[in-house]
Amino acid sequence: MAKKDQLTLRGPLYGNNRSHSKTITRRKWNVNLQSCKIKDTNGKVTRILVSTKTIRTLKKQNRF
């Protein structure tokens, strides 16, 4: 399974590590994915992987 948010499709971000001696190595920041249950329009409960940022947004919209 891909490490992506199933609602917003947010994936990992890529960048550089910078040490004190200024050497550069590539690194990856993964999204903080959590499994949660959500109701669809028919009232059916499904389990999806979403990021914690998306969970906060859903709680603010009372859709969680």
UniProtKB/Swiss-Prot annotation:
Residues 1-21 are annotated as: Disordered. Keywords: Ribonucleoprotein, Ribosomal protein. GO terms for cellular component: ribonucleoprotein complex; ribosome. SUPFAM superfamilies: L28p-like (SSF143800). Pfam families: Ribosomal_L28. Disulfide bonds: none annotated. One of its GO terms (molecular function) is structural constituent of ribosome. It comes from the Bacteria. One of its GO terms (biological process) is translation. Belongs to the bacterial ribosomal protein bL28 family. NCBIfam families: L28. PANTHER family: 50S RIBOSOMAL PROTEIN L28 (PTHR39080), LARGE RIBOSOMAL SUBUNIT PROTEIN BL28A (PTHR39080:SF1). This is Large ribosomal subunit protein bL28.
